[in-house]
Swiss-Prot record:
Record flagged with keyword Ribonucleoprotein: no
Organism field: Streptococcus pyogenes serotype M5 (strain Manfredo)
Highest taxon, organism lineage: Bacteria
Known partners and oligomeric status: Homodimer. Heterotetramer of two MnmE and two MnmG subunits.
Amino-acid positions noted as binding FAD in the UniProt annotation, renumbered to this chain: 15-20, 127, 182, 373
Extent of the signal sequence: none
Name of the protein this chain belongs to: tRNA uridine 5-carboxymethylaminomethyl modification enzyme MnmG
């Protein structure tokens, strides 16, 4: 079929949420003429649920996005109202930053960034169909009948894809926050042959700040010590007048109200059909599943400086409006609170992610990429990370350049994408530190060391950032080398000082680096013995030095594991392999191989239901059966 196109682009991105914004900024910054199409321009980078960025694992993803040249970290650093480092009492592998956002300012700032970006056209329009010829994307069709040509299309529709809002007995077609749902596009994705799933998520009610009795709650302030998501942000710009959050709890009365109205809860009445998030359950689900708990935490989170709306984190619900009011008034501090918005659930279609490659391109259609909640994830950060990778690979494909695949040992983004394309997901996927087997080398403090060079190679890291990175890396390398070259000897003067500080004396000569491996010796103590660096070091470099030195043995073991896995990742599996021709592999393994069609031995080994014996048989088969190459 010959199409008459009214406009032509290199890449078209459908949806301007957190995934779509990162995807479109990446493609345009890499030199591709890009269209970012959205149902509603006023909802660009909107936060329909929690007014925050970061958190456990997620905060590290934002740092990775920033290190690669993405925008989320810079944007939240300009628009937060509170910043807090989590898990400070635990090891460095699980520390992560979380910011409370001014949600309207966040969206406005991001929209301004998109509007200023060269090569990027922003358009309010509904995309109804993706045009495909001979298994390859050629463009899109709008609801008004316009046809736009494209060499690649990135679908980032979030929860709008056949979205339906559920509130008590009420259910109606809608995207998030009562925006339009994208129904025709959902139908057409299915017609293209993609396997579609149905998920559900929810959001809590918002209450009016001036109606809250804060005296009955516990204050949750931000940190005084400067921390940032972007490696380019300055400590001098760290916000001093942060806005606190507040902690309260449900109680037995709250639980009684929920239990007495479970028959009206869509979660239990059968109205909700989609699968909900395991790690962000509704309050009614929590009360039923954890009936022995006397109370559940609720955090009162301001949604910005210029609004009275307060997000009641932990109270996600789709109970009827009258029940929500009673529930709120049963909570300490909220006895007289005014409910400004009701909580609700939303069901939406997803593209089952086992149909994707690690580039986030669909296996079925060349040039068609998907990212974000469209792939079954939950969270703004997971969406933004996928959007960035999908956008990068869409641009690389258009330009005929090698694709970018982040491995599990490269980034949390790599862990997430590998989980999605290798294992799929039966529920909204959330990143957790426990999902990363190499988490000690995927830390908050070293995301730039891991990824900035990659961002530079693909054209997303500008000269200013690259220069700052080179200075930091040189300072780090030089100081590490210096600490490893200076020796402390167990002489009387040295040991007298060591003992004065309350530490065990030296029995053998050791380098300053070895001295720092002692749990009680920090960088400041070490340099008090050996003298300071040639130039003043930033606190973030000192933090990185302490972590790398104190955990060196564990880090080395992790890197050894990475090297072993790399060898398995380098063993490619032909695209045209006949899985039925391989004798002796288990039936379950054969079925999984057919469904996922892994690209490497490493990926095959991570598929659930596949055991080491199956991998051994597969490797023997490949060694004796040709060297066909995988092509897309």
């Amino acid at each position: 079929m010959t199409h008459e196109f009214t406009e032509s682009y290199d890449v078209i991105v459908i949806g301007a949420g957190h995934a779509g914004v990162e995807a479109s900024l990446a493609t345009s910054r890499m030199g591709c003429k890009t269209l970012l199409a959205t149902i509603n321009l006023d909802m660009l980078a909107f936060m329909p649920c929690n007014p925050s960025i970061g958190g456990s694992a997620k905060g590290i993803v934002v740092r990775e996005i920033d290190a690669l040249g993405g925008e989320m970290g810079k944007n939240i650093d300009k628009t937060y109202i509170q910043m807090k480092m989590l898990n400070t009492g635990k090891g460095p592998a699980v520390r992560a930053l979380r910011a409370q956002a001014d949600k309207s300012l966040y969206a406005r700032e991001m929209k301004h960034t998109v509007e200023k970006q060269a090569n990027l056209t922003l358009r309010q329009t509904m995309i109804d169909d993706i045009l495909v010829e001979d298994g390859r994307v050629v463009g899109v069709l709008t609801a008004t009948g316009q046809k736009f040509a494209a060499k690649a299309v990135v679908v980032t529709t979030g929860t709008a894809l056949r979205g339906e809002i559920i509130l008590g007995e009420l259910k109606y077609s809608s995207g998030p926050n009562n925006s339009l749902a994208s129904v025709t596009l959902a139908d057409n994705l299915k017609k293209l042959g993609l396997e579609i799933g149905r998920f559900k998520t929810g959001t809590p009610p918002r209450v009016k700040a001036s109606s809250i009795n804060y005296d009955q709650t516990e204050i949750q302030p931000g940190d005084d010590k400067p921390n940032h998501f972007s490696f380019m942000s300055k400590d001098a710009d760290y916000l001093k007048d942060q806005i606190p959050c507040w902690l309260t709890y449900t109680n037995q009365t709250s639980h009684d109200i929920i239990n007495q109205n479970l028959y009206r809860a869509p979660m239990f009445s059968g109205i909700v059909k989609g699968v909900g998030p395991r790690y962000c359950p509704s309050i009614e689900d929590k009360i039923v599943r954890f009936a022995d708990k006397e109370r559940h935490q609720l955090f009162l989170e301001p949604e910005g400086r210029d609004t009275e709306e307060v997000y009641v984190q932990g109270l996600s619900t789709s109970l009827p409006e009258d029940v929500q009011k009673d529930l709120i008034h049963s909570i300490k501090g909220l006895e007289k609170a005014e409910m400004m918005r009701t909580g609700y659930a939303i069901e939406y279609d997803i593209v089952l992610p086992h149909q994707l490659r690690a580039t986030l391109e669909t296996k079925l259609i060349s040039g068609l990429f998907t990212a974000g909640q469209t792939n079954g994830t939950s969270g703004y950060e997971e969406a933004a990370g996928q959007g960035l990778i999908a956008g990068i690979n869409a641009a690389l494909k258009v330009q005929g350049k090698p694709e970018l695949i982040l491995k599990r040992s490269d980034a949390y983004i790599g862990v997430m994408i590998d989980d999605l394309v290798t294992k799929g997901t039966l529920e909204p996927y959330r990143l957790l530190t426990s999902r990363a087997e190499y988490r000690l080398i995927l830390r908050h403090d070293n995301a730039d060391m891991r990824l900035t060079e990659i961002g530079r190679d693909i054209g997303l890291v500008d000269d200013e950032r690259w220069k700052a990175f080179e200075i930091k890396k040189n300072q780090f390398d030089n100081e590490l080398k210096r600490l490893n070259s200076i020796k402390l000897k167990p002489v009387k003067a040295t040991n007298d000082r060591v003992q004065e500080l309350g530490f065990k004396p030296l029995t053998d000569a050791m380098t300053a680096k070895e001295f720092m491996r002692r749990p009680e010796i920090d960088y400041a103590t070490a340099v008090s013995f050996v003298g300071p660096a040639a130039e003043d070091l930033d606190a973030k470099i000192i933090e990185l030095l302490e972590t790398e030195i104190k955990y060196e043995g564990y880090i080395r073991k992790a890197l050894d594991q990475v090297a072993k896995m790399k060898r398995m990742e380098e063993k490619r599996i032909p695209a045209n392999i006949d899985w039925d021709a391989i004798d002796s592999i288990a039936t379950e393994a054969r079925q999984k191989f057919k469904k996922i069609n892994p690209e490497t031995i490493g990926q095959a080994s991570r598929i659930s239901g596949v055991n080491p014996a199956d991998i051994s048989i597969l490797m023997i088969y490949l060694e004796g059966n040709g060297k066909a190459h995988r092509k897309y």
